[in-house]
């Protein structure tokens, strides 16, 4: 019987049904749901195949597994498509969903399709509008005018987390600062909790936890009051290094600090107002841009010395962190040092290490003994810090303070294809929340994308409405939610969409047991989801603090790049052809698959040529899931050959015994059976610890063992057991061929519903162990002895083995390391 993967996959997919009652669920497996861009790519294949292996394995372990899928369907690309192709975002999105759903099904993923939804469904976003109203009620949402990150290409505001190295996370455009009225969620209310609870996430990658820890950015320090000279005003400065106060030579404030209202030099005011604030985006960009400052002309009095400190306006100070003002000790802070060098400011050393340091070259940031610091002289840095705080508090000019780098989440976006914010503005009543009974507020369909600016604000009628409080003419909020709002709670929506969130089901199913996705979402989606759990718990929707128990972050799928002599990217097939023709082509390193680099491998082409099982097996072979994997055509061909061999080996074996009995077998046959169960045990352990590539290597080894057993005509009962084990353990990886082979060998029911094979523990017990015999610590020989041998018998064997080395010497002592070594200590005879 020939292996026709297209017939096999089509036949099997028609028979699968993974419907489960959520009230019976014992295990919740979820992958980060896709944006419906139009096609499933290889990164999706890896993500979803990993999740599917876990889901299928857990079902085989006897658990009722919940494995849903949905669509993260709002977003700017749909608007861009509407403009480019003259098609509505709704139509474009639904068409893409239909295509991608078909692709996902062709991969053979064991999804609960009956739970499918898209976040652009009004039934879905109705509930997040309800959440927002409750966030308002509980003080977790508010509106204010603030400096925001403006993406000039996408024409919308971005949250701090969406600005990467000063550029928009999607467009790559350099971000500008603008002042706009925006809606915010108070994620900072949970900053301490979000940070502290990272310790409880034992099954999250340490790298992700570290990224969140740094993003939340707890700083414990003090606020010190500095009196402004000539003005009845105090400047509050935050510092984590109060012990360096005696080394302060200037103060730096943000370009937006309110103290600057006291600057009365017209030219200085113009310089400050005209400063390009695009460099003041986040700490990462501040650390890379050249230090720049303006002497404001204002002066602060040092609180402990009879000196005045000039106040500079500096581009390395952010108004939204701390107090927007810092005192600067150039000798012991590199950033302050660079600034002081540029503007010829004093550098006063107050920390002295054992060896001399050259403060002409760089700041000294290590530990040492305090000096030139009055009452702190001779103290260690830690003691000096405590003493300085006590002194300043006693003077009434200092208080302890904790700040977080984390800022509240700005959720207003000036786009059409998103969830409308349920707010009405009335000239008489002000800000009026929409009544819950009037939800959902839906999007208009007759939208014009040719005009610049906010499409909803440009709509001729949609924004006009009546005030629900007084009945007067009013206007709707025309901004929509940041699309991360939708993805921050979808895992809970699967537990009860259609009636909102089912509290009992959520409390039972959440947190998600296994969550799979890219590490690039560490401080966006993953952090927002943790916040949402806490916010929804505060509002009474459920009682869940963390969204995901176990997090698995997969690496990227990479492919070689090809460039012509002009540096233009080539499609791989064109590059290879040109190389064969002797033309100049540069083969670049393997990079993440990207349309712009023309190194994308299309999933449909692979499935059509090799089949879904080949694609699944390749994407899980060779490389641990957390590492990047390189796509190689020869490897997918090798996987395809293996599947054909597997099929032929099992189909051609004509002595298969369904009711196999493996008793009373020869010792040689027993060794084969022991090996089979050892491999089964290894595969099971590999799956428990997500070592999918190791599990693949092991079941391919098992295939080779079975092939050898068949060639040597080993007992057909033992061979049959091994074949049944092999078919079952490959099913999570290559479910189509496994399901079909199960039918061929007479398996009962559907393979996907069968339990995982049990390892016979007796077969894993070592009958013999190798013991190293030593004399005075030197190797003599390794001997095989029974595992349960007693010490006296072992000593007798060792003495016999070492007799020639012992000779006429006296045995002084014999030491035994159980299961490993026996060492005979001898002394020469006198």
Curated annotation (Swiss-Prot):
Its EC number is 6.1.1.4. CDD domains: Anticodon_Ia_Leu_BEm, LeuRS_core. GO terms for biological process: leucyl-tRNA aminoacylation. One of its GO terms (molecular function) is leucine-tRNA ligase activity. GO terms for cellular component: cytosol. SUPFAM superfamilies: Anticodon-binding domain of a subclass of class I aminoacyl-tRNA synthetases, Nucleotidylyl transferase, ValRS/IleRS/LeuRS editing domain. A motif ('HIGH' region) lies at residues 34-44. It holds the Pfam family tRNA-synt_1g. Keywords: Aminoacyl-tRNA synthetase, ATP-binding, Cytoplasm, Ligase, Nucleotide-binding, Protein biosynthesis. It is found in: Cytoplasm. A motif ('KMSKS' region) lies at residues 592-596. It catalyses: tRNA(Leu) + L-leucine + ATP = L-leucyl-tRNA(Leu) + AMP + diphosphate. Gene3D superfamilies: HUPs (3.40.50.620), Isoleucyl-tRNA Synthetase, Domain 1 (1.10.730.10), Valyl/Leucyl/Isoleucyl-tRNA synthetase, editing domain (3.90.740.10). ATP binds at residue 595. Belongs to the class-I aminoacyl-tRNA synthetase family. This is Leucine--tRNA ligase.
């Amino acid at each position: 019987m020939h292996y026709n993967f297209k017939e096999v996959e089509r036949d099997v997919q028609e028979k699968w049904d993974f419907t489960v009652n959520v009230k019976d669920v014992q295990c919740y497996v979820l992958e980060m749901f896709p944006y419906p861009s139009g096609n499933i790519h290889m990164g999706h294949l890896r993500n979803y195949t990993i999740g599917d292996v876990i889901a299928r394995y857990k079902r085989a372990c006897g658990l009722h597994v919940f494995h849903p899928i949905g669509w993260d369907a709002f977003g700017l690309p749909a608007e861009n498509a509407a403009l480019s192709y003259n098609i509505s975002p709704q139509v474009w999105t639904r068409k893409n969903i239909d295509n991608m759903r078909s692709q996902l099904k062709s991969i053979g993923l064991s999804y609960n399709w009956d739970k499918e939804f898209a976040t652009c469904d009004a039934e879905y976003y109705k509930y997040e509008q309800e959440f927002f109203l409750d966030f308002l009620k509980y003080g977790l949402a508010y509106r204010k005018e603030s400096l925001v990150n403006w993406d000039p290409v996408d024409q919308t505001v971005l949250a701090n987390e969406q600005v990467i190295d000063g550029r928009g996370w999607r467009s790559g455009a350099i971000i500008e600062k603008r002042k706009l009225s925006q809606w915010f969620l108070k994620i900072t209310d949970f900053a301490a909790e979000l940070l502290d609870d990272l310790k409880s996430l034992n099954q999250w990658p340490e790298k992700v936890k570290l990224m969140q820890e740094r993003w939340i950015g707890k700083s414990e320090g003090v606020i010190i009051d500095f009196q402004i000279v000539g003005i009845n005003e105090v400047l509050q400065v935050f510092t984590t290094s109060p012990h360096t106060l005696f080394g302060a030579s200037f103060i730096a404030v943000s370009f937006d600090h309110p103290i600057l209202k006291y600057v009365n030099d017209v030219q200085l005011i113009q310089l400050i107002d005209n400063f390009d604030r695009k460099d003041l985006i986040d700490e990462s960009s501040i650390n890379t841009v050249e230090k720049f400052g303006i002497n404001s002309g204002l002066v602060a009095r040092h609180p402990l010395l009879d000196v005045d400190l000039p106040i500079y306006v500096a581009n390395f100070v952010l108004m939204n962190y701390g107090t927007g003002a810092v005192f600067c000790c150039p000798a012991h802070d590199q950033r302050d040092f660079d600034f002081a060098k540029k503007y010829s400011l004093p550098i006063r050393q107050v920390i002295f290490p054992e060896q001399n340091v050259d403060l002409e070259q760089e700041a000294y940031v290590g530990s040492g003994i305090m000096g030139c610091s009055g009452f702190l002289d001779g103290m260690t840095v830690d003691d000096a810090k405590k003493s300085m705080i006590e002194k300043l508090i006693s003077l009434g000019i200092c208080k302890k303070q904790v700040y977080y780098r984390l800022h509240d989440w700005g959720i207003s976006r000036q786009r059409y294809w998103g969830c409308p914010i349920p707010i009405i503005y009335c000239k008489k009543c002000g800000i009026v929340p929409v009544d819950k009974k009037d939800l959902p507020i839906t999007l208009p369909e007759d939208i014009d994308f040719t005009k610049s600016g906010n499409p909803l604000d440009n709509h001729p009628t949609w924004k006009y409405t009546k005030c629900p409080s007084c009945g007067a003419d009013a206007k709707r909020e025309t901004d929509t939610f940041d699309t991360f709002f939708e993805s921050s709670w979808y895992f809970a929506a699967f537990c009860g969409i259609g009636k909102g969130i089912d509290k009992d089901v959520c409390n039972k199913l959440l947190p998600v047991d296994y969550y799979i996705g890219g590490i690039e979402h560490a401080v966006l989606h993953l952090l927002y989801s943790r916040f949402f759990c806490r916010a929804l718990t505060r509002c009474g929707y459920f009682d869940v603090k963390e969204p995901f128990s176990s997090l698995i972050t997969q690496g990227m799928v990479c492919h070689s790049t090809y460039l012509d002599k002009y540096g233009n990217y080539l499609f791989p097939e064109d590059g290879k052809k040109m190389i064969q023709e002797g033309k100049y082509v540069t083969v670049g390193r393997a990079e993440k698959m990207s349309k712009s680099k023309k190194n994308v491998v299309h999933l449909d082409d692979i499935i059509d040529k090799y089949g879904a099982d080949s694609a699944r097996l390749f994407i899980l072979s060779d490389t641990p899931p957390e590492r990047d994997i390189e796509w190689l055509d020869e490897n997918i061909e090798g996987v395809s050959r293996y599947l054909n061999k597997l099929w032929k080996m099992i189909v051609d074996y004509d002595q298969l015994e369904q009711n196999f009995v493996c008793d009373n077998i020869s010792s040689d046959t027993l060794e084969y059976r022991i090996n089979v169960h050892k491999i089964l045990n290894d595969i099971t352990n590999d799956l428990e610890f997500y070592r999918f590539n190791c599990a693949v290597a092991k079941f391919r080894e098992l295939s080779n063992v079975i092939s050898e057993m068949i060639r040597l005509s080993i007992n057909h009962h033992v061979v049959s057991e091994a074949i049944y084990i092999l078919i079952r353990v490959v099913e999570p990886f290559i479910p189509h061929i496994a399901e079909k082979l199960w039918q061929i060998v007479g398996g009962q029911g559907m393979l996907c519903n069968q339990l995982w094979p049990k390892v016979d523990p007796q077969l894993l017990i070592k009958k013999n162990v190798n013991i190293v015999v030593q004399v005075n610590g030197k190797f003599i020989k390794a001997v095989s002895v029974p595992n349960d041998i007693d010490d006296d018998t072992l000593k007798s064997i060792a003495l016999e083995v070492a007799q020639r080395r012992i000779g006429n010497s006296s045995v002084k002592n014999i030491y035994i390391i159980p299961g490993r070594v026996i060492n005979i200590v001898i002394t020469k005879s006198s």
